[in-house]
Every structure is written in C-alpha cells, then in structure tokens.
From Swiss-Prot:
Pfam families: TM2. One of its GO terms (cellular component) is membrane. It is found in: Membrane. Residues 183-231 form the TM2 domain. PANTHER family: BETA-AMYLOID BINDING PROTEIN-RELATED (PTHR21016), TM2 DOMAIN-CONTAINING PROTEIN 3 (PTHR21016:SF7). Glycans are attached at residues 87, 99, 139, 155, 169, 179. This is TM2 domain-containing protein 3. It comes from Xenopus tropicalis. InterPro entries: TM2, TM2D1-3-like.
Length: 247
C-alpha cells in the first residue's frame, strides 16, 4: 500500500515538472521569435515613408509648365515661361529690347530649330496696367446698376494675357464702368410696349412686375401710360429691373 502511494506521488511530481518545462519552453520560444518579426516591421515603415516622399518630390511639376509649349520658338514663349532682365529706365511708349532666358524645364529653339538658352524679346515700354483693354481680362461684376446717373464704377482685378509683355505685376486692380447684360433685348421691349403695352407686357418682360400690374389693371393708364413707356423705352431711360444693359 505504501509503495503504491509513493509511486503516485512520484508520478505527480514528474507530471508537475513536465508541465513547468513545457510552459517555460513555450514562453521562451514566443519571446525568442516574436522580437525579430517586430523588428523588421519597425524598420520597414521609415524606409517606405522616405521612398514615397522622394518619389513625390521628384515628380512635382512647376505650375508654369502648363502654359509653356514644348519645343517652341523661344521668343514666342508666354511671359510666364521666361525670365527677363527688365528695367524701368526705358522711355514710355518707345520700343525696347530685353535679354531673357527660358525657365527651368522649358525647352525652346531659335528660328533655325537649334536649342537656345539666351534670347531677346521686343516690347513697348509700358506697365501692365497701361496696356490696351484687348491685352488683359478682368473679373466682371453683375451686382452693380448699369442704368444710373452718374454711371456706376466698380473695383475689380485684371490679368494680362499670356502673349502680352509688360513691366510690373501682371495682375493689377482696376476700376471699370458697370457694363453687363442679363439677356434683355431693346427691340423686344419696344415691340411689346407698342403692341401690348396696355396690358403691361413690356414691364413684365423687363422684370418690373409692380408697374406691369399697374398698367394691366388700369388698361395702360387709359393709353397715356402706354405712350409714355414707348417713349421712355425708345430712348433707353427704362431698362431691365436687374440693372443690366440691353443686348
């Protein structure tokens, strides 16, 4: 009986030692193999970030390249594609010549189709805001009244066209007369005033619905209001309600 109990105790001790050995071995293996796997992942992210950043920097194209023709004549390049040694000592209104170079990345040629680095351009000595209106475009306003006395002006920003050369900033402020149209025709308004003016059709067409209702319910002011409107529309005194000009 005693040997049997002793044998059971020995078996329990051996089983306990075996379990401890297995557990300690698994923990060692888990610690041993998990660290090398984490290390390469840790080292991988910085290199990927650097490669992506380098690639984005290398493929970035300057904004002016969109306006620059490829393999064109240097002297005909847009102003944004060249750098010129301008000066303000020239005589206003007189022809002047400046030395220029194409900007970085712009490839151009001379009249003989040979690559050219330095070239000259001829222009009139004047600042950009002194150019004729055909050489720049401005932001138009539709919030001002064209029919007013005195005639309204508004402040806007103008930009010189690519083919025009000038001194100073190519974007400048300017004050312009209010000049826009909403699509109303003077001939249509006059025809409606003559034919259907007694029903207020001319005023409704111009967007003046209050006056149109007044003419409609008074039968054109018994003809007097109709005659007055024909005269006012014919001379341009009565215009669209939105303040625009006739077409």
């Amino acid at each position: 009986m005693i040997p049997m109990m002793t044998l059971k105790r020995v078996c329990r001790v051996l089983l306990f030692i075996t379990q401890m050995y297995v557990l300690s071995g698994r923990g060692f293996l888990s610690f041993e193999y998990s660290e090398p796997v984490a290390q390469p992942l840790k080292d991988h992210f910085p290199s990927s970030t650097i490669a992506t950043s380098t690639k984005a920097t290398a493929t970035k194209i300057p904004d002016y390249m969109e306006k620059c023709p490829s393999n064109g004549q240097c002297s005909r390049l847009p102003s944004d594609c060249m750098t010129c040694a301008t000066n303000y000592s020239c005589i206003y209104g007189k022809p002047v010549t400046f030395n220029c170079t194409a900007k970085n990345g712009v490839v151009c040629f001379d009249v003989n189709s040979q690559p050219q680095e330095y070239f000259t351009i001829s222009m009139t000595c004047q600042f950009c805001w002194q150019l004729p209106p055909s050489d720049y475009v401005c932001n138009l306003s539709s919030s001002c009244k064209t029919v007013s006395c005195p005639r309204q002006r508004y402040n806007t920003t103008c930009t010189v066209l690519d083919h025009a050369h000038c001194l100073g900033n190519r974007t400048f402020p300017k004050m312009l007369y209010c000049n826009w149209t909403g699509g109303y025709k003077w001939s249509t308004a006059l025809a409606l005033s003559i034919t259907l003016g007694g029903f207020g059709a001319d005023r409704f067409y111009l967007g003046q619905w209050r006056e149109g209702l007044g003419k409609l319910f008074s039968f054109g002011g018994l003809g007097i209001w109709t005659l007055i409107d024909v005269f006012l529309i014919s001379v341009g005194y009565v215009g669209p309600a939105d303040g625009s000009l006739y077409i």
